[in-house]
Amino acid sequence: MITKLIPRKVFFTSGVGLHSEKLESFEVSLRDAGIEKFNLVTVSSILPPNCEIVTKEEGLKELSPGEVVFCVMSRISSNEPGKTLSTSVGCALPRDISKHGYISEYHAYEENAQDVGEHAKKLAGSMYSTWTNEAPLKTFSIPRSSSVQESGDWMTVISAAVFII
């Protein structure tokens, strides 16, 4: 029998990491977001039908270190001093929970968190409306922004929607 991997729950998180090595700055951003213990697999932009949105704390209780975890992630890195890095995931909730919604990911240089968050909400809402010909029940986003320090160390900023099967 084939088991369908349809997430039951989702939580949203973000993080910032700084390190002299690019890869390690990503690891630090995962730690800041609280999702460093998992083998993350990025997926595209569907919020499954009947998927419950939970807090990060509730979601983390259901996951185990080393578990393969699916997520929609926005990620950006740079070591250019003073450069602003911003990420966001946006979500469009369906009017009927038995239908799917959308999750968008967006990142940008030199844009603030509010603008990136608004853009991610707009993307998710647009994907939903062009499918249903109606506005979503609600849109929201989880933006994060930070500026690279003068030291020139690598900075990585992430935002993620993390699924629980």
Swiss-Prot record:
Pfam families, sorted: PvlArgDC
Cofactor remark from the record: Binds 1 pyruvoyl group covalently per subunit.
Protein's name in the database: Pyruvoyl-dependent arginine decarboxylase 1
Top-level taxon in the UniProt lineage: Archaea
InterPro entries xref list: Pyr-dep_his/arg-deCO2ase, Pyr-dep_his/arg-deCO2ase_sand, Pyruvoyl-dep_arg_deCO2ase
EC number: 4.1.1.19
Cofactor(s) required for function per UniProt: pyruvate
SUPFAM superfamilies: Pyruvoyl-dependent histidine and arginine decarboxylases
Site (Cleavage (non-hydrolytic)) location in chain: S44, S45
Keywords: Decarboxylase, Lyase, Pyruvate
Family: Belongs to the PdaD family.
PANTHER family: PYRUVOYL-DEPENDENT ARGININE DECARBOXYLASE (PTHR40438:SF1)
Entry's Gene Ontology BP terms: arginine catabolic process
Molecular-function GO terms, alphabetical: arginine decarboxylase activity
Residue positions where Pyruvic acid (Ser) is found in the record: S45
Any coiled-coil regions, as ranges: none
Catalytic activity: L-arginine + H(+) = agmatine + CO2
